[in-house]
């Protein structure tokens, strides 16, 4: 499932004294099966952008194409009704996990929370429960958690349950808006590794909004930088992090691993690759030291 934005602009509170243009002529493609990361400083328009991907927001001008479906601003009541029907089905395939997603939990048990959306889309209770059991295991929680109140869980556990509720619809595209914010290190890594597993095993398209440059380097197939509602860069992580001027202009920092990598290069120590993970860096250093010893 490919998402394509053509000349998309969005204005909050249009035709009021509080009118504010947030997106300007966005042209962007989310490729099927890719892990796409969107970055930019606070207030740049990232969250507004992703809410166009499944019609939570409708472009003021321009169009959003999701496979064969075209989303444009409706001109009358009839078009609004028709669009609302199409968007309901679209949101089954393109799902969003928002910041502080644990605030979306509301049922008395974890099970009821996870099966709420599938039941509302006409999936049988038996199948919904089977999905819940599979998903709770996928996120690393015991099946006994299904009978617990979600409000008895830790922050990381609640975030995992919220993710299960999204995944229960079996979306083709999963959009995550700062999914690890305010979590401890272990919970952050568990969630990010889990999302990568979903992409690989279920061939799911992932869109991640983050301020964490380490995640950009480690996970992104493609990265888009948004600044003041416009696309400032689209390309590979290596291209982004090799352009110091671009990073500075968009208030982005190098990932920690690349800071060390460039310090090595300044000392004429070339490890021979652009590391995306600490393991790659340490393995390359070990191999370099080994070769040096063998040549002595």
State what each model feature region is:
Residues 228-229:
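Conserved ABC ATPase "signature" C-loop
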Residues 149-153, 157:
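Conserved ABC ATPase signature
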Residues 62-78, 90:
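Conserved ABC transporter NBD signature motif
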Residues 170:
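Conserved catalytic motifs of ABC-family nucleotide-binding domains
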Residues 127-144:
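Conserved ABC ATPase "signature" region
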Residues 174-177:
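Catalytic Walker B motif of ABC-type/P-loop ATPase nucleotide-binding domains
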Residues 54:
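Helix-to-loop junction immediately C-terminal to a conserved catalytic motif
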């Amino acid at each position: 499932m490919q998402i394509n934005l053509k000349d998309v602009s969005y204005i909050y509170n249009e035709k009021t004294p509080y009118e504010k243009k947030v997106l300007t002529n966005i042209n962007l493609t989310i490729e099927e099966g890719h892990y796409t990361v969107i970055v930019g400083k606070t207030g740049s328009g990232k969250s507004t952008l992703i809410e166009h991907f499944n019609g939570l927001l409708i472009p003021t001008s321009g169009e959003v194409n999701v496979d064969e479906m075209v989303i444009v601003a409706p001109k009358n009541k009839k078009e609004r009704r028709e669009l609302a029907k199409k968007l309901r089905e679209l949101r089954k395939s393109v799902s969003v996990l928002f910041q502080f997603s644990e605030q979306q939990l509301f049922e008395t048990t974890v099970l009821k929370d996870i099966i709420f959306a599938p039941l509302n889309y006409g999936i049988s209770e038996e199948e919904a429960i089977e999905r819940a059991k599979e998903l709770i295991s996928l996120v690393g929680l015991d099946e006994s958690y299904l009978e617990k109140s979600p409000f008895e869980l830790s922050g990381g556990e609640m975030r995992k349950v919220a993710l299960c509720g999204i995944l229960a619809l079996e979306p083709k595209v999963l959009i995550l808006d700062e999914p690890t914010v305010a979590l401890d290190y272990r919970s952050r890594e568990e969630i990010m590794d889990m999302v990568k597993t979903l992409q690989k095993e279920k061939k799911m398209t992932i869109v991640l909004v983050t301020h964490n440059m380490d995640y950009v380097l480690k996970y992104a197939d493609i990265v888009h930088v948004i600044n003041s509602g416009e696309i400032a860069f689209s390309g590979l992580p290596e291209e982004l992090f090799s352009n110091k001027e671009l990073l500075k202009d968009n208030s982005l920092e190098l990932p920690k691993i690349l800071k060390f990598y460039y310090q090595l290069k300044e000392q004429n120590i070339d490890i021979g690759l652009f590391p995306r993970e600490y393991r790659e860096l340490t393995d390359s250093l070990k191999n370099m030291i080994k070769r040096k010893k063998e040549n002595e």
